[in-house]
């Protein structure tokens, strides 16, 4: 396992990563930037190359502006590749990487999923109505990658299958048709995912999920898979007590490097497609906070019911604030909480500052 502390870019941390935050990273690059187009608001969208090999890998992050964990991991990877490490040298010798760290700078600036026109770029791959989508497609066609890495964040509600473990990292080899056939490009992507999953089972056993492979030809992964290019969806999820996603960032970094190693060393066929389907499919079994016996605090709640709370991420003064909101009320059998509170237990509601907001939320509830 790589010593991550040597490669982590300490200049970018937290959840709010806009274009200004990564400008210092750009200045450290050994290669010139490539402007591939501009956003709705006229912001340059920039990419850069690393390596000189025949195996071409295109990777992009922050297609959704509020999904920044993978952007941090990409810069950690860049740091790693610039060091005098045998594997890094092999990757750069065997591969040419085209790296697009922020496809949606307008969304990143205001911490939204969509671009400035309120369009989800990951539902615009076929229609190509947005300048960011058109710039990406032009880059894809000119670079002609052999592999594509589509880098995202996922919500905290996902579990790794029907278990009490969060899906800390999830992957998908997207479908290329409604029948979800295992085409040659899908098979390659599946084997690369198996390689990453095998590695990740050491640091986070049982915490890797597989995304649903329902087909949508306006999603970028499905579109690229239709074009015959092995495409992998990476989803950075929740690690316990890591809402800033710094641990998940490390796991995404390790995953990207593992995939590049597998490509660079021609080890893809060492892995079996069948093992891809052994990765549990994501389920939605988690709340950020699961409160038992809320009727003890507020009699408006029904006895025997629980309250599932999820955090809303809000940008306040260039920081992300996590504001609790009631998501579901009911027996909630079979659900889990990243934090659980038992209202009978006075220790949980002893008014520590971290829980006052949740207590007030329960007290304000009215049917």
List the predicted regions and their residue ranges:
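C-terminal accessory segments enriched in acidic
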Residues: 1-20, 143, 172-367
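Short active-site segment of divalent metal-dependent hydrolases/proteases
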Residues: 65
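N- or domain-start disorder-to-order transition segments that initiate the globular core
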Residues: 24-40
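Short beta-strand-to-loop junctions in surface cap/lid or active-site-entrance loops
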Residues: 46-54, 62
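Active-site/substrate-binding loop(s) of hydrolase catalytic cores
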Residues: 54-56, 68-206, 225
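Conserved beta-strand scaffold positions in the cores of enzyme catalytic domains, especially
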Residues: 33, 47, 99, 148, ...
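Short, surface-exposed beta-strand/loop micro-motifs that present aromatic residues
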Residues: 44-49, 221-224
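Conserved hydrophobic/aromatic pocket- or pore-lining residues that grip, position, or stack substrates
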Residues: 42, 62, 99
């Amino acid at each position: 396992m790589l010593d991550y502390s040597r490669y982590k870019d300490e200049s970018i941390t937290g959840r709010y990563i806009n274009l200004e935050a990564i400008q210092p990273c750009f200045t450290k690059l050994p290669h010139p930037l490539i402007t591939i187009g501009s956003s709705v608001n006229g912001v340059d969208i920039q990419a850069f190359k690393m390596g000189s090999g025949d195996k071409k890998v295109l990777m992009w992050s922050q297609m959704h502006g509020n999904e920044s964990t993978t952007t941090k991991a990409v810069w950690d990877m860049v740091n790693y590749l610039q060091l005098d490490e045998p594997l890094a040298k092999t990757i750069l010798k065997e591969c040419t990487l085209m790296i697009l760290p922020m496809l949606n700078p307008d969304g990143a600036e205001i911490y939204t999923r969509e671009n400035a026109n309120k369009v989800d770029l990951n539902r615009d791959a076929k229609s190509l109505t947005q300048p960011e989508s058109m710039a990406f497609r032009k880059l894809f066609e000119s670079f002609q990658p052999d592999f594509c890495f589509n880098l995202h964040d996922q919500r905290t509600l996902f579990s790794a299958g029907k278990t009490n473990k969060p899906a800390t990292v999830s992957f998908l080899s997207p479908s290329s048709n409604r029948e979800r056939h295992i085409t040659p490009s899908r098979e390659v992507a599946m084997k690369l995912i198996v390689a990453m999953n095998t590695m990740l089972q050491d640091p986070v056993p049982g915490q890797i999920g597989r995304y649903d492979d329902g087909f949508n030809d306006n999603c970028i992964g499905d579109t690229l898979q239709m074009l015959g290019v092995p495409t992998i969806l990476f989803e950075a999820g929740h690690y316990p007590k890591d809402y800033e996603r710094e641990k998940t960032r490390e796991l995404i970094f390790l995953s990207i490097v593992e995939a590049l190693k597998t490509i660079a060393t021609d080890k893809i066929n060492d892995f079996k497609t069948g093992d891809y389907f052994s990765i549990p499919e994501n389920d939605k079994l988690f709340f950020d906070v699961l409160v038992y016996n809320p009727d003890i605090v507020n009699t408006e709640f029904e006895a025997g019911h629980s309250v599932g709370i999820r955090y809303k991420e809000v940008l306040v003064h260039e920081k992300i604030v996590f504001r609790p909101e009631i998501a579901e009320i009911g027996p909630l059998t079979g659900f889990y909480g990243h934090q659980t509170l038992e209202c009978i237990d006075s220790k949980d509601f002893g008014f520590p500052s971290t829980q006052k907001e949740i207590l007030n939320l329960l007290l304000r509830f009215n049917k």
